[in-house]
């Protein structure tokens, strides 16, 4: 870990059922020091595998499992794949816009997404206040990437933490029955935002190879994974 973070206080949660891999137990390490709640410190913490949920900064610390690997895209080295080029071509009629607040109709879209895609997950049933506590924080700049169609219909929202050297794709929800891959498209738009702002990295959270729903993250080149506290890729 970075020498600036050698002496932070860490608390461990109890083991509980894993949200992603059935029949496995999950445990997380939580950074306890409130002074870590700054943009500069959070950039260092993300580079060392941490992530946030609301104001809580954590990283997986499971006893018998190391499936969660932090993953990030190197923005200067990013290269579109053929399938991503095709997706952008099909999405020419769509547009994206970064905003400081979500549009008024966000919760209806979020509810459709959760009820269709994650009915067995921890965020079901969808609750407005619960999502707001999960997504927002008081010590980071959090922006909301909105995706619209040609009739200005809201198709997706990508919650994005924005910092000086990097951004973090925090959470994305979208129209579940739309015929294009809106989740992938949201990441491509976030990459575009990072390029426009001369950022180095876009963090995508954790990659779990055994979880098929996450494997889209590995299709972004050039990505890196944090393995044994070293970024590789």
Curated annotation (Swiss-Prot):
Places the protein is found: Cytoplasm
GO cellular component, one term: cytoplasm
Entry keyword Thylakoid: no
InterPro entries hit by this protein: Acyl_CoA_acyltransferase, Asp_Glu_LeuTrfase, N-end_Aminoacyl_Trfase, N-end_Aminoacyl_Trfase_C, N-end_Aminoacyl_Trfase_N
Similarity remark: Belongs to the R-transferase family. Bpt subfamily.
NCBIfam families: PRK01305.1-3, PRK01305.2-2, PRK01305.2-3
HAMAP family membership: Bpt
Protein name per Swiss-Prot or TrEMBL: Aspartate/glutamate leucyltransferase
Record organism: Vibrio parahaemolyticus serotype O3:K6 (strain RIMD 2210633)
């Amino acid at each position: 870990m970075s020498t600036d973070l050698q002496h932070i206080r860490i608390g461990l949660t109890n083991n509980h059922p894993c949200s992603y891999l059935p029949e496995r137990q999950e445990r997380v390490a939580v950074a306890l020091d409130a002074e870590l709640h700054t943009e500069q410190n959070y950039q260092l913490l993300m580079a060392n595998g941490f992530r946030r949920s609301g104001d809580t900064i954590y990283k997986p610390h499971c006893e018998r499992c190391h499936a969660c690997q932090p993953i990030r895209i190197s923005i200067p080295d990013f290269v579109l794949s053929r399938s991503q080029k095709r997706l952008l071509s099909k999405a020419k009629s769509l547009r994206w816009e970064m905003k400081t607040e979500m549009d008024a109709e966000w919760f209806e879209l979020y509810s459709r997404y959760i009820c269709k895609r994650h009915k067995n997950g921890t965020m079901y049933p969808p609750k407005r206040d619960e999502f707001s506590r999960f997504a927002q924080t008081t010590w980071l700049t959090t922006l909301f990437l909105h995706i619209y169609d040609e009739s200005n219909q809201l198709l997706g929202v990508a919650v994005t933490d924005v910092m000086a050297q990097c951004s973090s794709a925090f959470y994305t929800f979208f129209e579940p029955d739309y015929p294009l891959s809106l989740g992938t498209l949201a990441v491509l738009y976030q990459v575009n935002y990072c390029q426009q702002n001369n950022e180095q990295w876009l963090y995508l959270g954790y990659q779990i190879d055994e979880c098929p729903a996450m494997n889209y993250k590995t299709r972004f080149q050039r990505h890196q994974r944090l393995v044994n506290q070293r970024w590789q890729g």
